[in-house]
Amino acid sequence: RVKNKNIRKINNIELINYTFNLAKKIKLIDKIFVSTDSKKIIDLAKKKKINYILRPKKLSTSSSSEILSWKHSIKFLEKKGEKFDYFLSLPSTSPLRNQVDIMKLIKNFSTFKSDLAITVTKTNRIPYFNMVKINKDGFVKIAEKKKNYSKKNLFDITTVGYISTPEYILKSKNIFKGKVRSILVPRERALDIDDEYDLKLAKLLLKK
């Protein structure tokens, strides 16, 4: 994990500013909010004239549920009298996404009237294939027997973007149990920054 990764600079731009800059370019987005408990991120948001939602500490840990933070944001905004048809989440850890990806996501959601639309990329391996589990005694066992999977219909979920409605998010215990659609994004634009290696890779890809 990377400490304070959202404000780490990649090619002299804070990671979260890549998302701020993109969101401001998309005309279909009426209002932009950032949910955070960080004063530094709030200051960056203010410089971009972006609204902020103060996220509770209990929803700001590395193990916190993203969905719970969505619910908190929606409830907060509704109490403030905000009304909106769609809820679009653009996690700051995907700086390589572009306008085309997000416009496709919005169009897919509005066209097919699903409960949720997500972004995916083609998987590069079959789950559990060549994966092992290390037992307490230090010995290795195959994680699970190979199942009848095919790469053709298997995809990895990305953090490029998610879109739903406030109503669906608030009522759902598991958002994937509804009608879920997806759009395919290229793997090079689906990088999710989680560690130092990801930061180095993003730096190289963003220079292209």
Annotated model-derived regions:
Residues 68, 95-185:
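Conserved core of the sugar-phosphate nucleotidyltransferase
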Residues 1-36:
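N-terminal glycine-rich phosphate-binding loop and ensuing alpha1 helix
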Residues 57, 91, 121-122:
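Histidine-centered beta-alpha loop that forms part of the nucleotide-sugar donor binding/catalytic region
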Residues 33, 39-88, 96-104:
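Short phosphate-binding loop-to-helix
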Residues 29, 82-84, 113-115:
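Short, high-confidence coil segments that cap the C-terminus of an alpha-helix
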Residues 182-184, 188-208:
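Hydrophobic helical membrane-anchoring modules
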